A protein has these predicted regions:
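Active-site metal-binding core of divalent-cation-utilizing nuclease and nuclease-like domains
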Residues: 7-64, 163-168
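Catalytic cores of nucleic-acid endonucleases
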Residues: 72-120
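A generic structural signal for ordered secondary structure
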Residues: 57-65, 91-93, 118
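Short amphipathic alpha-helical segments, especially helix-boundary/capping motifs
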Residues: 1-5, 57-59, 78-81
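Residue-level "edge-of-site" marker
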Residues: 44, 98, 123
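Short beta-strand-loop-alpha-helix junction that forms the active-site gateway
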Residues: 62-63, 67-76
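Non-catalytic C-terminal interaction segments of nucleic acid-processing enzymes
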Residues: 4-10, 32-33, 49, 111-169
Length: 169
């Protein structure tokens, strides 16, 4: 049986979108299994550049941003995105194939900046470098928190609606 391999860049756009969608779904399921409450959509981050976070999640009182990099994505761009997200999130993680990230000349910069690096292995994920807590700005954080509240998710673990606090009737 003859097997041919195609570079991801050579795949049609709809195939690349499917690969990204499937990797994103794997990450969402993995995060849920680890106690995170991921936002179902990409999240807007108020930044002059790189405004859309691939996966954002709440764990306890902390906001987490995850930037997924496929084999055809630029690791340098991933570093720029992580820098942009750090104004609004407590923890920022790049998720990619281990070799691509660790062999990249930018690997030491991720480490120095305190960004986490996770390896994507099949349907699972493994932490290579744990992220350090960031100091988010209140205004940027508020923009992200509003997006979570629309889906009933709030940092701090209190997922109740205001209606739970008010007696009706």
């Amino acid at each position: 049986m003859l097997m041919t391999f195609t570079r991801i860049q050579n795949l049609p756009t709809n195939c690349r979108a499917h690969l990204y969608s499937s990797a994103r779904e794997n990450l969402l399921r993995f995060l849920e299994s680890k106690g995170f409450k991921p936002h179902p959509l990409e999240v807007f981050c108020p930044s002059p550049t790189h405004n859309w976070v691939d996966v954002a999640a709440v764990k306890g009182a902390d906001l987490w941003a995850f930037e997924y990099k496929s084999r055809s994505d630029s690791i340098r761009r991933g570093l720029e995105q992580c820098v942009s997200y750090s104004s609004a999130f407590d923890y920022v993680v790049i998720v990619a194939d281990r070799h691509r990230v660790t062999a990249s000349p930018y690997f030491s910069k991720f480490k120095r900046e305190g960004f986490g690096v996770w390896r994507h292995i099949g349907c699972g994920f493994q932490s290579i470098i744990p992220p350090k807590r960031r100091r988010s700005t209140p205004a940027a954080r508020a923009v992200v928190e509003r997006q979570f509240r629309r889906f009933g998710l709030t940092p701090g673990g209190d997922d109740r609606s205001i209606l739970d606090w008010v007696q009706v009737g």
